[in-house]
Amino acid sequence: MAPNPRKSHPLLKMINNSLIDLPTPSNISAWWNFGSLLALCLMTQILTGLLLAMHYTADTTLAFSSVAHTCRDVQYGWLIRNMHANGASFFFICIYLHIGRGFYYGSYLHKETWNTGVLLLLTLMATAFVGYVLPWGQMSFWGATVITNMFSAIPYIGQTIVEWAWGGFSVDNPTLTRFFALHFLLPFMIAGLTLIHLTFLHESGSNNPLGIVSNCDKIPFHPYYSLKDILGLALLLLPLTTMALFSPNLLGDPENFTPANPLVTPPHIKPEWYFLFAYAILRSIPNKLGGVLALAASVLVLFLSPLLHKSKQRTMAFRPLSQLLFWALVANLLILTWIGSQPVEHPFIIIGQLASTTYFIILLILFPITSALENKMLNF
């Protein structure tokens, strides 16, 4: 009998082992769909971004008008731009849900997969930040100025790093040019990291909602999960296209309809919604260096998740106290997101400080203590 090329060809064999004959736990829920949705988001962003880059000019005098030209004069340019801008929001929705699922079901115990995932999040955040600067609107310019200026808080070398990143003494043409270069490069880095992420995942096999070893009960990825993923893709593309067609500017900042002006500061500088929780943590500390460290810690704390796991059970499915804490953490993050969008005045300052403190207390102190308590309860 002739060998099946799907199982013998070097390249097809790799694809087959990752997407077709991959043994998958039979009980993984829709929460496991977000990995494939993130892959779709990445492909959509790279494709729309490539088309936008063909019409974009990375120059301070032309950037704003080149984006306007894309929307007005390029065939379906408005749609490509709207899909790209809102695609970023959906990318972050998916990654936050993906991380939340990993946290809830103890997927972080696959340490290599988890750590590459956190690196992916950091790279995605960097990509979104440099991309936000490119249209060269008011909030683009001032956002870039404020966030890059944070590095000046680093003792001794801070100011040098900032001027080196800017390519001058303020955010100007060299900054825009290098941000465009970085925004073009980083998505391909994300794609490379994704392959590493998948390699580590397929090394250990996927986790499941029960958190138990599922070697005795696995099914092939295709057709079961390939079909389930296609349903997920349809359910993601529906709200994305609806938003791009009906309310493309819903999540954007009105300030970005004004070209960048270094002489006029917007009344309230704030980043895109998906960075607001971290921005609120940054602002809640009156000291500049302290704020920058808290901002970094708000994301880097994810690296500690495997070390802080003290429970005898992997998932939170049967741990009501940990579930309560988890949802308190989700509510806390929503409060931080809201606070980040508000001006720096009473009562928002104190709410932000309380929410920031609670965020770190829940993650670093309450979760391990609760896990230890639940372990004790198991013995009764």
From Swiss-Prot:
The keyword Electron transport applies. A ubiquinone binds at H202. Keywords: Electron transport, Heme, Iron, Membrane, Metal-binding, Mitochondrion, Mitochondrion inner membrane, Respiratory chain, Transmembrane, Transmembrane helix, Transport, Ubiquinone. The chain crosses the membrane at residues 34-54, 78-99, 114-134, 179-199, 227-247, 289-309, 321-341, 348-368. One of its GO terms (molecular function) is ubiquinol-cytochrome-c reductase activity. Its main location: mitochondrion. Component of the ubiquinol-cytochrome c reductase complex (complex III or cytochrome b-c1 complex) that is part of the mitochondrial respiratory chain. The b-c1 complex mediates electron transfer from ubiquinol to cytochrome c. Contributes to the generation of a proton gradient across the mitochondrial membrane that is then used for ATP synthesis. This is Cytochrome b.
